[in-house]
Amino acid sequence: MRSLLLQRIFFFFYSFAWILAKPLLKKHKRLREGYAERVAGGAWSDMAEKKPVTLWIQAASGGEAYLTLALLKYIPKTHARCHILCTSMTKQGMEVLQKGKQAFEKAWREKYTEDCPKISLCYFPFDDKKSMQKAFLLARPKICILLETELWPHFMRLCKANKSLLFVVNARMTEKTHKAYQKIKWIFTGFNPDKIFATRKQDKAYYQDIFPQSTCVFMHNIKFDTVYQELNCAMQAAKDNSLKKVFAPNVCVYLFASVRQEEELELLALIEKLHAKKTKSAICIVPRHVARFAEWKKALQEKGLFVHFAAELFENNKQMQAQDIIVWNRFGDLKDLYALADYVFVGGSLAPLGGQNFLEALVYGIIPHTGIYLHNFLWAFEMQDKTKNLAEENLLCLHENTAMLAETFLALPEEKSTQHTQIQERFKIWLKPLIGDTKRIMQEILENAE
């Protein structure tokens, strides 16, 4: 009784907070984009004229939206008549979904003669009572999926009220988040997900603690499937690389990829030492954020180092030479850079920032060096059936600090790598036991749609 009373009090104040917040959110620089849909207007109004939603998949932002697309790949032709609603909270997420929808429809028509499943795209509504009730009334979903880390109280409450099955897929939860939810888990009493697919045993335990009435099981991360598919494409692709024209054939290249601002000072000192010792090598720096391009160039110049922007190489039809330092100020080139570099450090990992996608380096045939702060990628280290993790397989080099990274990089020979294909083959063998759960889980969920 006490927990139910607390729950009612929570939802009263939670709803009131949304009422106060919505006028401010309407003026918010990021959230005013698609505001009509965020209050279940706009494109949501068209949902009433469509058949009920078979499957509603919610992805917070761009990263999760790619997971939505991975799930869509495993919709069988027996579900050609289903209606799928894909939502996201950000402009980036919606752009990923829009592009992915077009690719999905094209691929479906090339593969099957049956009509393509209807896919609707909308911004995810604010989790206030009025907006979410309206969204459920219009969509009438049979099955709902939350991806990764999201738990929305009104959304979950309405899943139960409307008898919509709720699954949490690729579920993750940090220790900090778990401790916070432990204190208020009574909020979710009676609104538990029907099944939770967690990407680590620890995540499974965390979710089971918060939702004791839910079925919680382990799954291999969806990203293993997407990485495996990308690896196959990379290995089958033509050898042409648009960046080759700016890479001198005999110059060793050290690549610092997705470097974050919090790592700059320490890496600046390392790059200065590397430049002084590695006289036959070039150094290429790819900042994670565009605002840091000019800052990197300025900081290096203040050290007395001569620096080029990558765009200058292309404009002047020049190649990287030994002793060059290049700040890469072009977008969309990182994959091709991995394929051409000889040594790589992947950033976001020397400070507690969670890490950046080091698996992508392996896809293009180069062993990544990282720091130890990789908490966003812990799922890549939890192996089943005695499989060794990437570090144990010598497919990842971990460094506790910048000093260790410097010692390693300074000791490496100035040689062009000839191992890209062999590394890809080793990575493919490592990935093979970890793939397949995306298809299996999608099949299990869609069984409930029949």
Language model features by range: what are they?
Residues P193, L334, A339-W430:
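Catalytic binding pocket for nucleotide-activated donors in carbohydrate/polymer assembly enzymes
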Residues H83-T90, M94-L97, Y254, E262-D333:
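Donor-nucleotide binding loops and adjacent catalytic segments primarily
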Residues P433-E450:
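C-terminal alpha-helical cap of glycosyltransferases
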Residues M1-R38:
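A transmembrane-helix-recognition feature enriched in membrane-embedded lipid enzymes
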Residues S131, F155, R292, N329, ...:
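Short acidic active-site motifs
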Residues K26, R30-G42, A48-A238, L255, ...:
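Active-site and donor-binding regions of nucleotide-sugar-utilizing enzymes
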Residues S164-F167, V307, P368:
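Hydrophobic beta-strand scaffold residues
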Residues K130-A139, E315-Q323, G332-D342, V363:
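Short acidic alpha-helix that forms the nucleotide-activated donor recognition element
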